[in-house]
C-alpha cells in the first residue's frame, strides 16, 4: 500500500475552494484593476505609488515561483523551461536595478526607480528648488506651464513658483545620457493681463551629453541667464 498522499483537487473541491475564497479573490482583482487603470502620475500620486509598489513586487514573486518550479518540476521538459524562465527573471530584475542606480547617480531622484520608465525629467529653478518628474520617454519638446502660481510639467504638479523662476535649460536624464532642453519661447499672462497667474514655456531639445545634474547645479549662474 502506497504511503503517498494524492494532493490533486477534483472539480467539486475546486468549486468549494473558490466559494470559500471568492470574496478575497474579487477584492484582490478589483484592487489590481484600480491600480493598473488609474495609476498615473497625472491623476493620483498616491495610487501611482501603489502601482509602482505592485510592479516592484512582481519580479521577486516571479523569481520565487520560478525557483519553486525548479524544485518541483512536473517533468524534465518542465524543469528546463522553469530554469530558463527563472534565469530570465533574475537577469531582468538585476538589469532593472543596475539601470535604476545609474539613473539615480545621474539625477539624484527617487523617480529613477520607477519600473515603468528609465527617464526622469528635472527642472532646476532659479530659487534653488529642484523639481523632478516621471516621464515615459525622451521627447523633442517639453512645455511646462505655471497656473495660479503652481508649476506643472507633463501634467504633474511640481512646485509653487513664479515665471521668473524657470531656468534657461531643463533636463531629461536616462541611465547613460543627459538630454538638455533650451527655452525657445515664453508666453506670460492670462486674459486679465496677470503675468504671474499663467505662463507657458516651450523647451526644445538642444543637445545630449553624459554629465550629471550635480555638475550643473554647482557650475555657476550661467544656467539661469
From Swiss-Prot:
It is found in: Virion membrane; Host Golgi apparatus membrane. Its main location: virion. InterPro entries: GAMMA_CORONA_M, M_CoV. Residues 1-20, 73-77 are virion surface. It is a multi-pass membrane protein. The chain crosses the membrane at residues 21-41, 52-72, 78-98. It holds the Pfam family CoV_M. GO terms for cellular component: host cell Golgi membrane; membrane; viral envelope; virion membrane. Residues 42-51, 99-225 are intravirion. GO terms for molecular function: structural constituent of virion. Keywords: Glycoprotein, Host Golgi apparatus, Host membrane, Membrane, Transmembrane, Transmembrane helix, Viral envelope protein, Viral matrix protein, Virion. Component of the viral envelope that plays a central role in virus morphogenesis and assembly via its interactions with other viral proteins. Homomultimer. Interacts with envelope E protein in the budding compartment of the host cell, which is located between endoplasmic reticulum and the Golgi complex. Forms a complex with HE and S proteins. Interacts with nucleocapsid N protein. This interaction probably participates in RNA packaging into the virus. HAMAP family: GAMMA_CORONA_M. Belongs to the gammacoronaviruses M protein family. This is Membrane protein. The gene is M.
Amino acid at each position: 500500500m502506497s504511503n503517498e498522499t494524492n494532493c490533486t483537487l477534483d472539480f467539486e473541491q475546486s468549486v468549494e475552494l473558490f466559494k470559500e475564497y471568492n470574496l478575497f479573490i474579487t477584492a484582490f482583482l478589483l484592487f489590481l484593476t484600480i491600480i493598473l487603470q488609474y495609476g498615473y502620475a497625472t491623476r493620483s500620486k498616491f495610487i501611482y505609488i501603489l502601482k509602482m509598489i505592485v510592479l516592484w513586487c512582481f519580479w521577486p514573486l516571479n523569481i520565487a515561483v520560478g525557483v519553486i518550479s525548479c524544485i518541483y518540476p512536473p517533468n524534465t521538459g518542465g524543469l528546463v523551461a522553469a530554469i530558463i524562465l527563472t534565469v530570465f527573471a533574475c537577469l531582468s530584475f538585476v538589469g532593472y536595478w543596475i539601470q535604476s542606480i545609474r539613473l539615480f547617480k545621474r539625477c539624484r531622484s527617487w523617480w529613477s526607480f520607477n519600473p515603468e520608465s528609465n527617464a526622469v525629467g528635472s527642472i532646476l529653478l532659479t530659487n534653488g528648488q529642484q523639481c523632478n518628474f516621471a516621464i515615459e520617454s525622451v521627447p523633442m519638446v517639453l512645455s511646462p506651464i505655471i497656473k495660479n502660481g503652481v508649476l506643472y510639467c507633463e501634467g504633474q504638479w511640481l512646485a509653487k513658483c513664479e515665471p521668473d523662476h524657470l531656468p534657461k535649460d531643463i533636463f531629461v536624464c536616462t541611465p547613460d545620457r543627459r538630454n538638455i532642453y533650451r527655452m525657445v519661447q515664453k508666453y506670460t499672462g492670462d486674459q486679465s493681463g496677470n503675468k504671474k497667474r499663467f505662463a507657458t514655456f516651450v523647451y526644445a531639445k538642444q543637445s545630449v551629453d553624459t554629465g550629471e545634474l550635480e555638475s550643473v547645479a554647482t557650475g555657476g549662474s550661467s544656467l539661469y541667464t
